[in-house]
Regions:
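Left-handed beta-helix
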Residues: 2-190
Length: 190
């Protein structure tokens, strides 16, 4: 029902649970001692991904054998790390090709970071391509985004977000904190 409501943000705390209460439906609580984070915003999704990179302070150890991860990863070849690539404190999934610099970031399946490109404190979803000389910092790039050569996305401030399937043209700039839902032309600043 909530999914069909165009006015709903499809949020458990804001929409779904209050609607169940209004309808007089039975609900039960469960005391959960493990890690949980509401990732209903772009910023909270970014924060949760950064916490995975810091198991000592977050308590999240994805390599703990007792903590099962159930997923359906695509069948892709192993990661390719180029001869001049730098990868530090990051999670890199299958099919990624890294020839540039990746620091403190989470890269989903099939991401390509070309030589001379820099990715830092970022979450890159499936199929993202970061072209040579581009800089991507403190942002989330949705699926199949292409960041053109020499482009800059994000900065040191608030998290930037680029929507699914968009192209950030060569030499373009997406400022920190920007929410981009249309492609950005070559050299343009948003």
């Amino acid at each position: 029902e909530d999914e069909a409501d165009p006015n709903s943000k499809n949020d458990f705390g804001m929409n779904i649970i209050p609607a169940l209460l209004r309808d007089g439906r039975k609900m039960y609580a469960y005391h959960f001692n493990g890690y949980w984070r509401d990732v209903g915003t772009i910023d909270s999704l970014w924060e949760a991904n950064m916490e995975v990179l810091d198991p000592e302070n977050s308590g999240i150890d994805i390599f703990d054998e007792k903590w099962k991860i159930y997923s359906r990863n695509p069948v892709l070849p192993a990661q390719k790390i180029g001869p001049r690539a730098v990868v530090q404190d990051s999670l890199v999934t299958e099919g990624c090709q890294i020839y540039g610099c990746v620091k403190h970031s989470v890269l989903s399946a099939g991401v390509v970071v070309e030589e001379g490109a820099t990715v830092e404190d970022a979450v890159l979803m499936d199929g993202v391509v970061v072209k040579a000389g581009a800089v991507v910092k403190r942002c989330i790039l949705a699926e199949n985004v292409v960041v053109g050569a020499g482009a800059k996305v994000g900065g040191d401030g608030p998290i930037a977000h680029v929507g699914t399937g968009l192209t950030i043209g060569a030499g373009a700039t997406v400022k920190e904190g920007a929410k981009v839902f249309d492609s950005v032309k070559e050299g343009e600043e948003v």
